UniProtKB/Swiss-Prot annotation:
It catalyses: D-xylulose + ATP = D-xylulose 5-phosphate + ADP + H(+). Monomer. PANTHER family: SUGAR KINASE, XYLULOSE KINASE. GO terms for cellular component: cytosol. This is Xylulose kinase. Its EC number is 2.7.1.17. GO terms for biological process: D-xylose metabolic process; xylulose metabolic process. ATP binds at residues 355, 441-442, 445. GO terms for molecular function: ATP binding; D-xylulokinase activity. The gene is XYLB. Phosphorylates D-xylulose to produce D-xylulose 5-phosphate, a molecule that may play an important role in the regulation of glucose metabolism and lipogenesis.
C-alpha cells in the first residue's frame, strides 16, 4: 500500500528464510506501509524451494547470497514505484534468520564503499563473495565440528556455560569450522564473515557492519557474560577468525549513517541512521515488547518459548542469548517439537475432531486433573529428548489410557508444565509483574490459555505478531535513535498497541504443586522409555547429577504449598546427550 503524505518514520527489515520484508512505522508507532519479496516466487532463477537449496546428502542446506542482494534491489524499486517517501526515514534496523553466515572476499570492502547509484546492488556485488551459496540455520552437516568444539572446551556443559548453548550444527562457529576444514582456499580468501543480520546491515551501511551481541550469541563463539569473542572457541574453529569477525557491539548501537548510494538512488536523507541488525528471534522479542519477568509462548506446529532473564543458568537444552533491548539482561529460547499437531491428534482421538468439544473437556475437568497427567511425544521431542505417550494417575502409576476429557486436560497441562520446568531450568522465575504473551494458532482458544495462566500463575495476553521481527526492528531503530543503552526500551515503545488480556489464573492456581508433580512424572516417563538400556542408565545418572539449583527451587516451592510432600525421586530430566 502506498503512503504519499509526509510521515516521519523508521524502517524495520526482515531477511528471513523465504522472503525479505519491510515495514514502515511512524512516530506514534503505527505500521503504515509494508512490502515483501518472496524468493521462490519473485526470484525463480535461483531455483530455491522454501528459499533454500537442500543438497544431495540431505544435511547440507544453503541459500544463494546474491538472491538476498537482488531481493533488496527489487523491494526498494517496488517501494519507489509505489511512491514511498524515503526522505522521511529517520533510521532503519533489521533482522536476519539466525546462524547463517556470509563470506566476503578480500577487496569487498572497497566495492561496498564505492557503489554507483546508476546500477542495482546485485550487479556490483556479484564478485564479492568467496562462497556463493552460504549455510543457513536448516543445515545439519557439521556434527563432526560440534563434537570437536565441545571436546576442546571441556564438554557440552562447559561450552553452554560460556556461550549460552551447547554445540549445535546450525550454529555459526561450527559452520565456519566445517568450511575451513573442507574449503580452506575459500576461507583464506575471506576478509570478513557476517551473519545474515550484519550482512544485511552492511548493504545499507556501505561498509562492514559489526555483529551485535544478541545475534552473536547464536554462534557458539561469544562469551555471553563478558560480551567478547571466546579466544578458546575461536581457536578451536579456525585460524585468524577474530579479525574476520570484527568486534561485536551492543544490539542498540547506531553503526553509522546510510550509504550515499541510497541517498542518490532512492532519496534517503544523508542523516538516516543504521542501527545494528540482529537475529529474527531477538527482533521478535523486541516486537512483542517483552519486559523483565515476561514470557512469550508461540503455540504453533512447534511450540517456542521466549524468556526474559536477568540471571541465566545455561543448560544442555535451550539457548541463552544476550538481550537485544537491554544489554545487561538475557533472553532464552526453548523449542518443543510436539506442538499443534499433537494437540490436533488428541482432539481427533478424544474430542470428536472438534475444537468445541476439546474446549468442553477442559471446562468439565478440574485444575490439576485429579492428579492425572500425561506427556505426549508422537515425534522425538527436542526438550527433553524422548518419544511416546506417557500417562500417570494420581498414585504416579503409569496407565495405558485416560477417559477422553481427562486425556485432553492431561495433554494441555502436561505441555505447559513441561514448558515451565524447562524455563525454570534456564533461570526463569515467575514474578508478581509477569505477563505471558501467547501467539500462534492455539492462542485463539481461551480454554487452552486458561490452563496456561493456571500453570504459570500469571495473566495471559494475546498479541498480533504477524510481522513481529519487522516491527521489532523498527522499534529498535527508534530505540537506537533515542540513545540506546541510555534509554529504557519500554519508554521508547510505550505508545505501541497494547496486548489484549485473555486469561487470568484461577483462584488457588499459584498454590498448586504444578512443578513437583510434573517433574516426577516426566522423570518416570523417561525411565520407563529407557529402562534397562545403557541410555536409560545415562539418563538416570543425568537426573541425579544435573538437577542443581532447579531441583532445590522446586523443593522450596513444594514446601510452601499445602499439597503432599514430593516423592523421593524428584529430579529433573535432562537430554540423553548430557553424558556424551
Amino acid at each position: 500500500m502506498a503512503e504519499h503524505a509526509p510521515r516521519r518514520c523508521c524502517l524495520g527489515w526482515d531477511f528471513s528464510t523465504q522472503q525479505v520484508k519491510v515495514v514502515a512505522v511512524d512516530a506514534e508507532l503505527n505500521v503504515f506501509y509494508e512490502e515483501s519479496v518472496h524468493f521462490d516466487r519473485d526470484l525463480p532463477e535461483f531455483g530455491t524451494q522454501g528459499g533454500v537449496h537442500v543438497h544431495k546428502d540431505g544435511l547440507t542446506v544453503t541459500s544463494p547470497v546474491l538472491m538476498w542482494v537482488q531481493a533488496l534491489d527489487i523491494i526498494l524499486e517496488k517501494m519507489k514505484a509505489s511512491g514511498f517517501d524515503f526522505s522521511q526515514v529517520l533510521a532503519l534496523s533489521g533482522a536476519g534468520q539466525q546462524h547463517g553466515s556470509i563470506y566476503w572476499k578480500a577487496g569487498s570492502q572497497q566495492a561496498l564503499t564505492s557503489l554507483s547509484p546508476d546500477l542495482p546492488l546485485h550487479q556490483q556485488l556479484q564478485d564479492c563473495f568467496s562462497i556463493s551459496d552460504c549455510p543457513v540455520w536448516m543445515d545439519s552437516s557439521s556434527t563432526t565440528q560440534c563434537r570437536q568444539l565441545e571436546a576442546a572446551m571441556g564438554g557440552a556443559q562447559a561450552l553452554s556455560c560460556l556461550t549460552g548453548s551447547r554445540a549445535y550444527e546450525r550454529f555459526t562457529g561450527n559452520q565456519i569450522a566445517k568450511i575451513y576444514q573442507q574449503n580452506p582456499e575459500a576461507y583464506s580468501h575471506t576478509e570478513r564473515i557476517s551473519l545474515v543480520s550484519s550482512f544485511a546491515a552492511s548493504l545499507f551501511l556501505g561498509s562492514y557492519s559489526p555483529i551485535d551481541y544478541s545475534d552473536g550469541s547464536g554462534m557458539n563463539l561469544l562469551q555471553i557474560q563478558d560480551k567478547v569473542w571466546s579466544q578458546a572457541c575461536l581457536g578451536a574453529c579456525a585460524p585468524h577468525l577474530e579479525e574476520k569477525l570484527g568486534p561485536p557491539v551492543p544490539s542498540c548501537s547506531v553503526v553509522g549513517a546510510i550509504s550515499s548510494y541510497y541517498v542518490q538512488r532512492y532519496g534517503f536523507p544523508p542523516g538516516c541512521k543504521v542501527v545494528a541488525f540482529t537475529g529474527d528471534n531477538p527482533a521478535s522479542l523486541a516486537g512483542m515488547r517483552l519486559e523483565e519477568g515476561d514470557i512469550a509462548v508461540s503455540l504453533g506446529t512447534s511450540d517456542t518459548l521466549f524468556l526474559w532473564l536477568q540471571e541465566p543458568m545455561p543448560a544442555l537444552e535451550g539457548h541463552i542469548f544476550c538481550n537485544p533491548v537491554d544489554s545487561q539482561h538475557y533472553m532464552a529460547l526453548l523449542c518443543f517439537k510436539n506442538g499443534s499437531l499433537m494437540r490436533e491428534k488428541i482432539r481427533d482421538e478424544s474430542a470428536s475432531r472438534s475444537w468445541s468439544d476439546f474446549s468442553k473437556a477442559l471446562q468439565s475437568t478440574e485444575m490439576g486433573n485429579g492428579g492425572n497427567l500425561g506427556f505426549y511425544f508422537d515425534v522425538m521431542e527436542i526438550t527433553p529428548e524422548i518419544i511416546g505417550r506417557h500417562r500417570f494417575n494420581t498414585e504416579n502409576h503409569k496407565v495405558a489410557a485416560f477417559p477422553g476429557d481427562v486425556e485432553v486436560r492431561a495433554l494441555i497441562e502436561g505441555q505447559f508444565m513441561a514448558k515451565r520446568i524447562h524455563a525454570e531450568g534456564l533461570g526463569y522465575r515467575v514474578m508478581s509483574k509477569t505477563k505471558i504473551l501467547a501467539t500462534g494458532g492455539a492462542s485463539h482458544n481461551r480454554d487452552i490459555l486458561q490452563v496456561l495462566a493456571d500453570v504459570f500463575g500469571a495473566p495471559v495476553y494475546v498479541i498480533d505478531t504477524a510481522n513481529s521481527a519487522c516491527v521489532g526492528s523498527a522499534y529498535r531503530a527508534f530505540h537506537g535513535l533515542a540513545g540506546g543503552t541510555d534509554v529504557p526500551f519500554s519508554e521508547v515503545v510505550k505508545l505501541a498497541p497494547n496486548p489484549r488480556l485473555a486469561a487470568t489464573p484461577s483462584p488457588g492456581a499459584s498454590q498448586r504443586r504444578w512443578v513437583g508433580v510434573s517433574t516426577t512424572k516426566l522423570v518416570s516417563a523417561s525411565d520407563a522409555q529407557h529402562r534397562g538400556s545403557n541410555l536409560g542408565r545415562r539418563v538416570a545418572g543425568a537426573m541425579v547429577r544435573k538437577c542443581g539449583t532447579m531441583l532445590e527451587d522446586t523443593r522450596v516451592l513444594l514446601k510452601q504449598s499445602s499439597w503432599p510432600k514430593p516423592a523421593a525421586n524428584l529430579d529433573i530430566i535432562k537430554t540423553p546427550e548430557t553424558l556424551s
